[in-house]
């Protein structure tokens, strides 16, 4: 980009909230940073993405957004003013011209529990929010403002979606303070700090620290080995109170044959997507992203085809007096 890229200080612990619990944008948290060689190289790769005919969904997306030209400072102010007045075309232009900014920021959050396309999708929501609230008369560039919103939506998604049990955002932020303090103490003390040591460092009650740390305990997988010399997993010793008998198994086989017959009443694309998503016709059940990668479509397009296919299948099943929800669990 011709303008400076922007760096936003870590806002997880310092963010302020209004009376409705919505984070308040902090202009003081923004610092301009000259673009690095890596950033410039990444920009060049993104611009070349449109010419690469690769089936990988991420590369396809990068190619698509490569067609959108960047805005000059003057164009940015022009379109931002029109967007504030409700001009839909200007709003869309602001969004499309900054999609590469979202990709660059999303890549910094790799290996945090979410796939890159999911990070980009969350970041795009932040970009849309930034376009809706940006006031060009405030004196700073749009990328400054948008970076803050993009990072907030991505970080919140990581907090929410990478936990088996979701916690309120204010609890997650407080927990992060305790965990960061625990990491710092572990380096100083050469051992894992106790709740008492963390509480003393933060001047907090020990009971509060212990309660918060328990929220971070991991859920044990039923596939995890029991330990010792045993090769059995927890799942192997749990009784299945709902195990199907012979009659149920026969009914299930008949139902599977019927599902295959109904699938072939869909068009080829709908049939393939549903088969890959739900593990039918010899396929293993797969995520939207994995299906998109296999058949050369974006995650969003796969989702749309799935919705269309399920809608058509629902119509077919209704004529049989059946409910599709009993067949597919998403």
From Swiss-Prot:
Region (Sigma-70 factor domain-3): 174-249
UniProt motif Interaction with polymerase core subunit RpoC: location: 118-121
UniProtKB keywords: Cytoplasm, DNA-binding, Sigma factor, Transcription, Transcription regulation
Segments of this protein annotated with the region Sigma-70 factor domain-4: 262-315
Start and end residues of each stretch annotated as Sigma-70 factor domain-1: 56-89
Sigma-70 factor domain-2: annotated span: 94-164
DNA-binding region: 288-307
GO biological process, one term: DNA-templated transcription initiation
Localization in the cell: Cytoplasm
GO MF entry, a single one: sigma factor activity
Keyword ATP-binding: no
Gene Ontology cellular component list: cytoplasm
Quaternary assembly: Interacts with the RNA polymerase core enzyme.
HAMAP family for the chain: Sigma70_RpoS
Function description: Sigma factors are initiation factors that promote the attachment of RNA polymerase to specific initiation sites and are then released. This sigma factor is the master transcriptional regulator of the stationary phase and the general stress response.
NCBIfam families: PRK05657.1, rpoS_proteo, sigma70-ECF
Family membership: Belongs to the sigma-70 factor family. RpoS subfamily.
Protein name: RNA polymerase sigma factor RpoS
Organism annotation: Shigella flexneri
Originating gene: rpoS
């Amino acid at each position: 980009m011709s303008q400076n890229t922007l760096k936003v200080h870590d806002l997880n612990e310092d963010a302020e909230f209004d009376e409705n619990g919505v984070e308040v944008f902090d202009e003081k948290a923004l610092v301009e940073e000259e673009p690095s060689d890596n950033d410039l190289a990444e920009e060049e790769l993104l611009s070349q993405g449109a010419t690469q005919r690769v089936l990988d969904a991420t590369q396809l997306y990068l190619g698509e957004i490569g067609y959108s030209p960047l805005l000059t400072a003057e164009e940015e102010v022009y379109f931002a003013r029109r967007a504030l007045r409700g001009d839909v075309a200007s709003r869309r232009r602001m969004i499309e011209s900054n999609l590469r900014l979202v990709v660059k920021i999303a890549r910094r959050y790799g290996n945090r529990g979410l796939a890159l396309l999911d990070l980009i999708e969350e970041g795009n929501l932040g970009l849309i929010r930034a376009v809706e609230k940006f006031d060009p008369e405030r004196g700073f560039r749009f990328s400054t403002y948008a970076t803050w919103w993009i990072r907030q939506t991505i970080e919140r998604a990581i907090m929410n979606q990478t936990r088996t049990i979701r916690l309120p955002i204010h609890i997650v932020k407080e927990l992060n303070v305790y965990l960061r303090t625990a990491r710092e103490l572990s380096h100083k003390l050469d051992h894992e700090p106790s709740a008492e040591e963390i509480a003393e460092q933060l001047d907090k009650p020990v009971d509060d620290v212990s309660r918060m740390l328990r929220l971070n305990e991991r859920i044990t997988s039923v596939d995890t080995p029991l330990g010792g010399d045993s090769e059995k997993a927890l799942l192997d010793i749990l009784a299945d109170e709902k195990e199907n008998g012979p009659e149920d198994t026969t009914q299930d086989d008949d139902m599977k044959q019927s599902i295959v017959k109904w699938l072939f009443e869909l068009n080829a694309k709908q049939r393939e997507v549903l088969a890959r998503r739900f593990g039918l016709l010899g396929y293993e059940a797969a995520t939207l992203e994995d299906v998109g990668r296999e058949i050369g479509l974006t995650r969003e397009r796969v989702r749309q085809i799935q919705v269309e296919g399920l809608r058509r299948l629902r119509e077919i099943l209704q004529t049989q007096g059946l409910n599709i929800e009993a067949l597919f669990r998403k």
